[in-house]
């Protein structure tokens, strides 16, 4: 699992996402943070139980977060490489896809409750609850996601020689200029999966078995 790999993939295949760069060197990371013409977020590249993203209030906090990961050992090996990227304004949503090569089924959009404090404040958690369908993901938003995120992503996987079969979690930020990718996961969302499973009318096990065997019926 690597957010740095994901960022490079998104750039390579022109999938909308936040501006940003990957760093293993603290001096270069600090220079980027201080020169960035926008507020930034700091992400540990590896797995961190949904808690590896720091949303600083200012550049001083951003530099401190970068140092904690690259020099202080925060998140262990997962923090040895970081992603510094533009803080996007908008509302997040989770899009789960059942993918079989160039075919896919999109499950209802969902949202989870991340912040630990009342009124959506405080540090991020791994998710403390979820609901679906998410009203913020309108038809227009989902059409945008299909055309500008999913299509180039699946084309990119094919170009990389990856016959992807399974769940693809696309975390998006719905901004004024369209949906942008926050993250990819190759699993169901947690806790989003708990509210999505009851909404799947077909047999989930049969669906997953079909995908594993390369015969997804997109009309299911």
Which residue stretches match the model-derived regions?
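Internal nucleotide-binding/catalytic subdomain
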Residues: 52-193
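C-terminal catalytic subdomain
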Residues: 199-212
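Conserved beta3 strand of the protein kinase N-lobe
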Residues: 20-22, 95
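Peripheral (often C-terminal) accessory segments that flank ATP-dependent C-N-forming ligase machineries
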Residues: 210-220
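Residues within well-ordered alpha-helical secondary structure of globular protein domains
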Residues: 35, 68-71, 210
